[in-house]
Amino acid sequence: MPKVPETLAPRRTSRQIRVGKVLVGGDAPVSVQSMTTTPTTNINATLQQIAELTACGCDIVRVAVPNRDDAEVLPIIAKKSQIPVIADIHFQPNYVYAAIDAGCAAVRVNPGNIRKFDDQVGEIARRAKAADVSLRIGVNAGSLDRRLLEKYGKPTAEALVESAVWEASLFEEHDFHDFKISVKHNDPIVMVKAYRMLAERGDWPLHLGVTEAGPAFQGTIKSATAFGILLGEGIGDTIRVSLSAPPAEEVKVGLQILQSLNLRERKLEIVSCPSCGRAQVDVYKLAEDVTSGFEGMSVPLRVAVMGCVVNGPGEAREADLGVASGNGKGQIFVKGEVIKTVPESEIVATLIAEATRIAEDMADAGAPSPSGKPTVTVGR
């Protein structure tokens, strides 16, 4: 593998907290979160979705607790989940206490809509501390306190930060410090501004998120833009990509963002040209076929799928494994050396065979067993 480039900036120094078995902040890796979309009371469906999220690399999962029935099943969900569970609480402070008692790893509280929240802080802090449960102060543009909306006229970055800092100070007055903060907005520009301001105000670990980001394509672009800016500046300790899409897609996008910024080990990466009039092979289909064939592998390999002789040979030589196509044939490269030329119809099978061989060699040398799915990067 080529040497992994350095990150754009050193990580911001933040205090470290624990969310179950996952460390957040400090020198811990940036973690990826998602949220279940099933009714929490449907225990089997919720646990099945958590299992799917775990399998695709999710570190922490959040579940909704909109009513008493949801609160009552939290002990089962928390006990049987493979990854730490955060209870997402709005409106009812009693559900915060229920989540703490249920054994959830953490609780997200929304200071903008929990009844008389400031009056509840002392008791929440006491009980969370006794149970070794961390919190997230989750400030959201869509549910900002009325007083701040009147002061600023709308949910500005300044309003979000003022809310977060005020609530943080209340918890700290009660000697409770095991919390992270989020200041989410659906506008990436406002969101970035808010997190930059918040990062200057204290050493709290920060949970990044663009709220209500939208459908998969739009939400991916908005989240990648905002996260890329902040994480590139060293700001951010855990992320959640909010998409109107299956939760597993949120995790895949989040992991790809971290890998692209060298904040996670790069897994199987397929570099394919965007195609043009010079292409002598159907690059789109070839890249899709290679990706499908590599499903189930996540070894750290860079595989180049190139459609012509302009960038093809050079890009393929820079990859661990690659093909440069033309005239109905494909030159197969391994570590920069041409090992064979095969008919176009055999390109995919040959790449898969060589990738499998390399993966087996890595396993024999003590590398982790391949798992998960490859990612596709379209380049050039």
From Swiss-Prot:
Metabolic or biological pathway, per its Swiss-Prot or TrEMBL entry: Isoprenoid biosynthesis; isopentenyl diphosphate biosynthesis via DXP pathway; isopentenyl diphosphate from 1-deoxy-D-xylulose 5-phosphate: step 5/6
> Which keywords accompany this UniProt record?
4Fe-4S, Iron, Iron-sulfur, Isoprene biosynthesis, Metal-binding, Oxidoreductase
Please name the top-level EC class of this enzyme.
oxidoreductase
* Residues noted as binding [4Fe-4S] cluster in the record, renumbered to the chain: 273, 276, 308, 315
Q: Does the keyword Manganese apply?
A: no
Name the coenzymes or cofactors required.
[4Fe-4S] cluster
Reaction(s) catalysed (UniProt annotation):
(2E)-4-hydroxy-3-methylbut-2-enyl diphosphate + oxidized [flavodoxin] + H2O + 2 H(+) = 2-C-methyl-D-erythritol 2,4-cyclic diphosphate + reduced [flavodoxin]
Q: Give an example GO biological process.
A: isopentenyl diphosphate biosynthetic process, methylerythritol 4-phosphate pathway
The family database entries (SUPFAM superfamilies) matched by this protein are listed as: Dihydropteroate synthetase-like, Nitrite and sulphite reductase 4Fe-4S domain-like
Catalytic activity, EC: 1.17.7.3
Q: How is the cofactor bound?
A: Binds 1 [4Fe-4S] cluster.
Molecular-function GO term, any one = 4-hydroxy-3-methylbut-2-enyl-diphosphate synthase activity (flavodoxin)
Pfam families assigned to the protein according to its UniProt record, in alphabetical order: GcpE
Name the family.
Belongs to the IspG family.
* Cited PANTHER family: 4-HYDROXY-3-METHYLBUT-2-EN-1-YL DIPHOSPHATE SYNTHASE, 4-HYDROXY-3-METHYLBUT-2-EN-1-YL DIPHOSPHATE SYNTHASE (FERREDOXIN), CHLOROPLASTIC
Q: Function of this protein?
A: Converts 2C-methyl-D-erythritol 2,4-cyclodiphosphate (ME-2,4cPP) into 1-hydroxy-2-methyl-2-(E)-butenyl 4-diphosphate.
Q: What is this protein called?
A: 4-hydroxy-3-methylbut-2-en-1-yl diphosphate synthase (flavodoxin)
Per the UniProt entry, what species is this protein from, by scientific name?
Leifsonia xyli subsp. xyli (strain CTCB07)
